[in-house]
């Protein structure tokens, strides 16, 4: 029986469905990084045996049954898997299901029939789940925000969310709020997350929320399916209702890219600062580099997630590791990208 490794991207995407960047579908819940044990990228590398150099020279066949390659995000994910295999001299087959669950199951069966050593599937019994360090990254983004406002200035924001009830989106939204609260009030991370959870309950229940201690308000929320086009529509509506805001919090940069068009059209480029919990697309990094009102983006790199999944697959195939050797979730390193560091992350040749 072949070992199957499930791979998931935090925020949007977990075992059942990759939806965030190309389909207008409600994203399913994903594992909550606060509720499961996790390895970091470095810990996984430390667990790799000293014989790995010899192991990498062996021929391994990796198969990736991907939900879709219909967007640059998915393309970059597949490319990350392919490049990681190529670096090791391994064979790699990517089969695209075009968002068809039946076809995806058929693709997995095809890969097993082709005797690949490790089929990577997004909806299988898992060795482990690999994704971006969602909560830590969003919290880091939030802590970075207050420096751009005077100590006694009200941070008056709206928020763009991907999908109702999406666990990853909730983690990102609450993470940014928790970071702001922690930085402005000097609270511990645990205390700030507790405050952020209560704040988020008010936001979901009432459509707006205010935190007196942090002098932070979110005056409106729009669900924009992780898409720039919906971010444009959502921001247009939010600006009509809330013309005096000075801040935009977005759960990903694609929605913020659409929102930026609405901000510019409304003549509010110099009024509203933009902060994104993720993802780090090429277009987002260009805004961060060239637009002084874009301040920070949390990194959610599909190539890095793909590469880490291949690394773990190699440990399973070549070293005989099992689910018992990994935590339930293995996460990539948490990074935030700012205007000072964006050139270290921006890749003009990136497919994403």
Task: Name every feature range the model reports, one short phrase each.
Residues 21-352:
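A residue-level marker of the well-folded mature domains of exported/periplasmic proteins
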Residues 1-11:
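Positively charged n-region of N-terminal signal peptides that target proteins for export
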Residues 16-20:
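C-terminal motif of bacterial Sec signal peptides marking the signal peptidase cleavage site
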């Amino acid at each position: 029986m072949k070992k199957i490794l499930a791979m998931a991207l935090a925020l949007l995407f977990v075992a059942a469905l990759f939806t965030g960047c190309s389909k207008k579908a409600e994203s399913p819940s994903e594992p909550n990084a606060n509720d499961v044990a996790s390895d970091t990228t470095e810990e996984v590398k430390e667990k790799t045996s000293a014989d790995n150099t010899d192991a990498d020279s062996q021929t391994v066949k990796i198969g990736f049954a991907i939900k879709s390659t219909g967007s640059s995000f998915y393309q970059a994910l597949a490319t990350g898997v392919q490049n990681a295999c190529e670096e090791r001299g391994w064979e790699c087959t990517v089969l695209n299901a075009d968002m068809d669950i039946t076809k995806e199951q058929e693709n997995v069966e095809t890969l097993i029939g082709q005797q690949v050593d490790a089929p990577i599937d997004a909806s299988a019994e898992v060795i482990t789940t690999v994704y971006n360090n969602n909560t830590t990254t969003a919290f880091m983004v939030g802590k970075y925000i207050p420096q751009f406002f005077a100590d006694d200035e009200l941070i008056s924001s709206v928020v763009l969310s991907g999908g109702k009830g999406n666990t990853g989106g909730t983690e990102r939204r609450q993470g940014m709020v928790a970071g702001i609260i922690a930085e402005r009030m000097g609270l511990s991370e645990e205390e700030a997350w507790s405050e952020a959870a209560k704040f988020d309950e008010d936001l979901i229940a009432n459509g707006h929320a205010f935190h007196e201690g942090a002098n932070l308000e979110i005056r409106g929320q729009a669900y924009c399916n992780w898409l720039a086009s919906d971010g444009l529509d959502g921001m247009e509506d939010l600006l009509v209702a809330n013309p005096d805001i000075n801040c935009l919090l977005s759960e990903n940069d694609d929605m913020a890219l659409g929102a930026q068009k609405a901000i510019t059209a409304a003549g509010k480029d110099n009024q509203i600062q933009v902060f994104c919990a993720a993802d780090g697309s090429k277009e987002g990094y260009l805004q961060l580099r060239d637009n002084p009102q874009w301040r920070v983006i949390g990194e959610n790199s599909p190539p890095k997630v793909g590469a880490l999944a291949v690394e773990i697959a190699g440990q399973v195939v070549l070293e005989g590791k099992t689910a018992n050797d990994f935590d339930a979730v293995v996460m990539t390193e948490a990074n935030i990208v700012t205007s000072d560091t964006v050139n270290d992350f921006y890749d003009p040749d990136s497919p994403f």
